[in-house]
From Swiss-Prot:
InterPro entries: MGF_505. It holds the Pfam family DUF249. Plays a role in virus cell tropism, and may be required for efficient virus replication in macrophages. This is Protein MGF 505-11L. Keywords: Early protein. The lineage of its organism: Viruses, Varidnaviria, Bamfordvirae, Nucleocytoviricota, Pokkesviricetes. Induction: Expressed in the early phase of the viral replicative cycle. It comes from African swine fever virus (isolate Tick/Malawi/Lil 20-1/1983) (ASFV). The keyword Ribosomal protein does not apply. Belongs to the asfivirus MGF 505 family. It comes from the Viruses.
Length: 542
């Protein structure tokens, strides 16, 4: 509440006698030669038929360092906050004292404290606006304000207090947030921090995107652990802060595979180029980066950049193939084919294993049909992927698939388990499609599957001339490969179904088979043929 005297001062009339107290400069600025009163009317001053705002008159009076008596009157004509702000700007302690003497219940005006450049005035002003009766609360409030508004000399003056009461860390956090570079350096070097967290300054620099903060962090006399710098590099890559990354790389010279891998994954081509130009990373690391780029669906330019840096003889690692399939990155396949050691067969094998139909379909553009089907069906058999086998066989010509399966069975010549599995698939497919029996007999004889051979013969029409000719061919195959059981079964089966005339020709074939066995030096087969001829000679003579 204003006293009556203060209320009267707010509506003061300045007579010509008082005018002498106004500075000559102020009167001239107002365009007056004094001959009348100054009259305050609400928010304006009426002076010799001219109107000026109360604020402009006060501002000019302070700038011209007018008499305190005049200013004491003018400050009552404006809002307290404006009067305080102007007094702070002009570093007028006497004006502040005047205002505070009038306004005993001053609100908190912390937000205008920064308007002064004087440490003394800053502390004096804070003394009045901080209403806490507790000394420590007032001190902490002052130090927080000094940090907020960058008054380093106040902090230096109260260094011991900061250390004693352990408030260095929260003050340091404020300095980082407000980007007061000089304060940041002071906090770190003045020994006022309880426990300095190395990441605080870096994290703040990245959060605010402030390069100058990062420079301060790098230039501080602190030995940072490698893991922290690597973490900051990864953050720079994620945020695509090239300047930040370059500063960290050149200042600390830390090169780790995880850095180039992250750059590839996030498709940061400028950072990748910077790293690759150092000629530090080996082929294996670049391949890992390539795998990460595929995983992150990086651009073609990024993939080409990595591929061109690889040694042409470097074997492509499995993680590259797995990345293509797992993350379904079809677009990278034609680019990878420029690598000499890239194998489509390996890719298809892994794709079949992962049941990735899209990748298999995409490979059609890069492989001949026969090769693709051979690889797909081969892997489908190995993995017993019935669904994929059916998908790639149901729409094709049965004999085309049969031919491919024959080739696959031959591929498994040294893998008995897989060959037996392939034979199972072949027999089942043959039965489903009702194919001619002859080709199946030939395959079974060639690979010595006697049990299935017998079953197939049992199901065949043995009086059919094609079947008879097939059995004779199987006889020669058995002779050549020394398959005694197949030979014996073919011999017995043919004797049962051949006519007298056919038996004579058959005997000539058996004699030729013996010569063939002698050529290959299959003694067991020679003995078998001799015993069979001796045993069934009576039939042949008859």
């Amino acid at each position: 509440m204003f006293s009556l005297q203060k209320k009267a001062l707010q509506h003061i009339y300045m007579t010509p006698e008082n005018a002498s107290e106004l500075s000559k400069d102020l009167l001239q600025h107002l365009g007056l030669y004094w001959n009348g009163p100054i009259i305050k009317m609400d928010t304006v001053v009426h002076l010799h038929n001219k109107i000026f705002s109360n604020r402009s008159v006060l501002k000019y009076a302070l700038a011209k360092q007018a008499n305190i008596t005049i200013i004491e009157t003018l400050v009552l004509w404006v809002e307290p906050e404006y009067a305080l702000a102007q007094a702070l700007k002009h570093n007028r302690k006497d004006v502040l004292e005047c205002i505070f003497s009038y306004h005993l219940t001053t609100p908190k005006y912390h937000h205008i404290m920064h308007l002064t450049s004087s440490q003394e005035l800053f502390e004096f002003f804070h003394l009045f606006i901080c209403k806490s009766k507790n000394y420590h609360a007032r001190m902490e409030c002052l130090l927080y304000a000094a940090t907020l508004y960058n008054f380093q000399n106040i902090l230096e003056k109260n260094r011991e207090y900061i250390i004693r009461h352990s408030i260095g860390n929260p003050l340091f956090a404020i300095a980082c947030k407000e980007r007061h570079i000089n304060l940041i350096a002071w906090f770190v070097t003045a020994g006022v921090l309880d426990t300095y967290d190395d990441s605080t300054l870096f994290n703040t620099a990245f959060k605010l995107g402030d390069y100058s903060l990062l420079e301060v962090a790098c230039d501080l006399p602190i030995t940072y652990p490698d893991y922290l710098i690597i973490s900051m590099m990864q953050t720079a890559i994620q945020k695509n802060y090239f300047r930040f990354f370059k500063k960290l790389l050149t200042h600390f010279s830390i090169y780790r595979p995880i850095i180039i891998t992250d750059a590839a994954y996030y498709d940061r081509r400028k950072i990748l180029l910077l790293l690759l130009n150092q000629n530090i990373f080996n082929n294996f690391t670049i391949l890992c980066a390539l795998s990460a780029a595929i995983k992150g669906h990086a651009s073609k330019k990024t993939l080409n950049l990595l591929i061109n840096r690889l040694d042409s003889q470097m074997t492509v690692i499995d993680s590259v193939y797995y990345s293509i399939i797992k993350y379904n990155n079809i677009d990278c396949i034609p680019l990878l084919m420029h690598i000499k050691t890239f194998r489509m067969e390996t890719l298809i094998s892994i794709a079949v294993h992962g049941d990735n139909i899209d990748i298999i379909a995409a490979c059609k553009a890069f492989l001949p049909k026969d090769t693709l089907y051979h690889l797909v069906l081969k892997m489908a058999i190995i993995l017993r992927n019935h669904k994929l086998f059916k998908l790639y066989t149901e729409k094709e010509h049965p004999m085309y698939i049969f031919t491919i399966l024959k080739a696959i069975i031959s591929d498994f010549i040294n893998y008995t388990v897989f060959q037996a599995l392939a034979i199972e698939y072949l027999c089942k497919f043959h039965q489903e499609k009702q194919l001619p029996i002859v080709p199946l007999l030939m395959v079974l004889a060639e690979h010595n599957y006697i049990t299935k051979f017998k079953k197939t013969c049992y199901a065949a029409n043995m009086s059919d001339q094609k079947v008879k000719r097939a059995l004779i061919k199987c006889l020669f195959i058995a002779t050549q490969k020394n398959y005694c059981q197949i030979f014996k079964y073919c011999f017995g089966s043919l004797l049962k179904v051949l006519s007298k005339h056919e038996q004579e020709k058959f005997f000539n074939s058996v004699v030729f088979a013996k010569k063939l066995a002698s050529y290959y030096d299959h003694q067991n087969m020679i003995q078998l043929i001799d015993s069979l001829i001796e045993r069934f000679r009576y039939l042949l003579k008859a």
